[in-house]
């Protein structure tokens, strides 16, 4: 048996080794023939050499039998009979040789066939490796291109994220600055209010000591100054509100932008999912085609593996072999192309899946950011809610103030009726008690009799003159106390007028073309519409109350001048109808004394106060529990801020 040769690295080298092996086998056959034929002459040896060369050239595909070589020798030299005779004996000897040579030749043929098959397999493997390398290189290039695209998209997304973060930081800083400025303005406002309250307290003390035209001028000047400061504060607050509105508009625009971006990403996700579905369908179709090709390939392999029918020793036709090779190459090429296509589709699917994952992560990040933005929006809406609460409190306070005013008017009427009755009693008593030589005292008594808030018991006519004089002097002392009380009530009225002026500043009339004079006839009795203008009605009512109070102040000053001027005193026995008419005309004096006597700022127990009247005590208590707008002047600004939003 011949030793099996190793697989050559290259087909050209395999061909050379095959030829060298064939030449070596031919040499060994020649040597064997020479050994078995010792009696052959030299000429025959030469002929054998020539025949051997001819035999080498003739047997390019394999080795022939010794009979064939002998026939070839006879065909070449028919003339020489000696050589024929000489060759007959070795041919006969060679015919007697055992069949081992034919067995060796068949073995050599089998080895040659196996080597050819191995050569084909190696060539096929080399082609497959080359194709696989080409596919890998193509896939690597495609992956590099996809990686570059992903890096570019990543850079763009990073820049967008940076810009969004920067804008968010900018908005946060602006909102913080606005909040700090608003806080400072509120602190400044509180300081100014405290300063104003301190100034009013000092002015009150000075007015209690001395009431003159100089103090009035100073008070008016300081009032104007405070009003200017309040106007400046109002302008600053309007600027802050405008900036806050701009920030809110920018916030809304940014929220809309985020919504649009989210819708865009969702649309892109839908497109990508549709593409993935189409790729999956194509992949299924390609799998089906691959299965078909694999079935056909398995059938071909099965057909090739089946034992062929016994053929004649002749070599099969090369045309059939070439046809089979072409079929096999075609099927292998189709299979390889299908495998390449499947690999590309799998790579594309992986890339699409990675993109979908990245987009899902981005959407999750945006969804995580949305609650933070909602919290910020809620934080921005918290001051608006506080404004609404303050607005509601302001409405309730105005309603309570209106109720208190109505009760005060009723109480003032009752007090006026009681005062008129007391005056009638006093005039009757003075006419009975009048003595000669006491006319001046009686005149002075009549001049101050209209301001007596308490009833004096009737004096019997059968008393002695000294007792009547002592009672009369006591009555005069009480009248002097009442005059002091009237001065205190006048100061309280000035303070009430100042608070109403502050309310005018803090409650501006927001209707276009409206003014304080137009709102004055309302007298505080205002009603808000169902949809809008509720705060406007409140502000107009407050301004109307202030104007009405100003008119009452003018009439009350005239009344005080007539009451305190001794030159215009009536005669002792006259009933003083002008004073009664003035008292009825300026009935707000009693109302002012009531409101001033119950204010917690003064805190002084006066004679003739409403605490003496049991019907006025619950009203006073209610007014102390629910003070008016003078105690909290910052509320109307918030009402002013909410008016344009309600109109929307």
UniProtKB/Swiss-Prot annotation:
Keyword terms of this UniProt record: Coiled coil
UniProt biased composition (Basic and acidic residues): 121-139, 441-453
Positions of the UniProt region annotated as Disordered: 1-84, 119-139, 356-376, 434-461, 508-549, 600-624
Cellular component aspect of the GO annotation: cis-Golgi network
Coiled coil: 105-160, 223-275, 318-424
Polar residues: bias regions: 50-62
Bias (Gly residues): 521-534
Pfam families in alphabetical order: GM130_C, GOLGA2L5
Biased amino acid composition, Pro residues: 1-11
PANTHER family (UniProt xref): GOLGIN SUBFAMILY A MEMBER 8C-RELATED, GOLGIN SUBFAMILY A MEMBER-RELATED
Family affiliation: Belongs to the GOLGA8 family.
Entry protein name: Golgin subfamily A member 8G
Source organism per UniProt: Homo sapiens
